[in-house]
Design a protein with these regions (language model features):
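Short amphipathic, charge-patterned alpha-helical segments
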Residues: 11-15, 161-178
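Histidine-anchored nucleotide/phosphate-binding helix
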Residues: 4-18
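Structured functional modules or segments
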Residues: 367, 371, 375, 379-384
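C-terminal accessory/binding modules appended to enzymatic or scaffolding proteins
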Residues: 140-154, 160-162, 166, 320-367, ...
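Hydrophobic alpha-helical positions that pack around
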Residues: 36-162
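Short loop-to-beta-strand transition segments
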Residues: 24, 175-190
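Ferredoxin-type iron-sulfur electron-transfer modules in oxidoreductases and energy-metabolism complexes
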Residues: 1, 23-24, 28, 32, ...
Length: 384
């Protein structure tokens, strides 16, 4: 959206011709002002050249494209919640069927895709499907953009062919683990361990181990990371982002967060582990949308691969990685863009700063809930 917005516009135009659409919307989080600005500029230029609007290039084909800024709710990544938000309603998923292709925006059939998908369309049209299928694996074609963050030397946005292994991404592109420490896990849907380093990143391989590509986030963790705290952190994020419409997600994630918090504070019991597993299965099977259905993956995978760390908390009442303590949170001034998202999310008003200037966390007020860490789009929140 920031680097080549014209490719998205071209892809949506091609899709509009194929589907017979005359209206299009690009839904962007308000926290990405540069993307919004460049998309609007690109749309205006396309309209000036007669590539958007009425009677495009002298034909009867008309297509109007709009940029819609979202309020930042994570659940609006779900199709029906996204369309509800564009319509001016609260972003909440609905029961399916009907699906968006049958009854989407304003009850009309709606083609809904990620901007990454639309940007690939012009290249496929120009070079052919055989060219596109030659990249990636037999069943997962093309490339994928990932946000590589965490305890790795080189962080940032990367684009790799589907089927690239985690080892290649972390150690060749990412430069390995910071400070010469050992690799422990990487979060992709759920934490994947050292035994998964040579696993290709494609849809089938990830599905087999209970992970998923999702939004393309890769969070690398080193040997000092407490995996129980990781599970608690991601559950806290999901619970905060739950729209509250369905009981399994609204109440289930809250109960799981309470249990995980007890365990991290060395106040849990062995029965809590069984309860976590039962709740995980129930929420996954009964939640209304993908947010709730995937909410328990970090808990399920950490219980499977790092159960010894849960036992250290509940049996020995001592964690070798965090000793029951939570580290202090700080904002990296070099990464912070001053978007203000963390200030709005902080329940204790512990974050201050001017818009477009680095923000600061007041460690005296901070309760280390992780809300800022979960919402920061730039990965600027650090634990020390």
């Amino acid at each position: 959206m920031e680097g080549n917005p014209h490719s998205i516009i071209e892809g949506m135009l091609i899709a509009a011709v194929a589907a017979g659409s005359d209206e299009g919307y690009i839904y962007v989080r308000a926290e990405y002002p540069l993307a919004v600005s460049r998309l609007k500029t690109a749309i205006a230029k396309a309209e000036e050249m007669g590539l958007l609007g009425d009677n495009i290039l002298g034909t009867d084909f008309c297509f109007h494209l709009h940029v819609n800024r979202g309020a930042g709710a994570f659940v609006c990544g779900e199709g029906s919640a996204l369309t509800a938000s564009i319509e001016g309603n609260r972003g909440m998923p609905r029961v399916k069927p009907p699906r968006t292709v049958e009854q989407g925006l304003w009850a009309r059939p709606t083609v809904l895709n990620n901007v990454e998908t639309f940007s690939n369309v012009p290249l496929i049209i120009r070079r052919g499907s055989a060219w596109y299928r030659s990249i990636g694996t037999e069943r997962s074609h093309g490339t994928k953009a990932f946000a590589l963050t965490g305890n790795v030397v080189n962080t940032g946005l990367i684009e790799v062919p589907m089927g690239t292994t985690l080892r290649q991404i972390i150690f060749e592109i990412g430069g390995g683990i910071k400070d010469g420490k050992k690799f422990k896990a990487v979060q992709i849907g759920g934490p994947s361990t050292e035994e998964h380093l040579d696993m290709p990143l494609d849809f089938d391989s990830l599905k087999k181990v209970g992970a998923m590509i999702g939004s393309g986030g890769l969070v690398v963790m080193d040997e000092d990371t407490c995996m129980v705290e990781v599970a608690r952190f991601f559950m806290n994020f999901t619970q905060n982002e739950s729209c509250g419409k369905c009981v399994p997600c609204r109440e289930g994630t809250r109960r799981m967060l309470e249990i995980l918090t007890r365990i991290v504070n060395n106040e849990g019991s062995l029965e809590d582990l069984d309860l976590l597993e039962d709740l995980s299965s129930t929420i996954t099977e009964t939640a209304l949308c993908g947010l709730g259905q995937s909410a328990c993956k970090p808990v399920q995978s950490t219980l499977k691969y790092f159960r010894d760390e849960y036992l250290a908390h509940v049996v020995e009442k001592h964690c070798p990685h965090c000793n029951g303590r939570k580290k202090e949170l700080h904002i990296d001034p070099e990464l912070c863009k001053g978007c203000g998202k963390c200030m709005r999310q902080c329940p204790m008003e512990a974050i201050s700063g001017q818009i477009r200037m680095p923000h600061v966390i007041d460690t005296e007020k901070c309760i280390k809930c992780g809300a800022c860490w979960g919402c920061c789009p730039f990965g600027a929140i650090r634990e020390e």
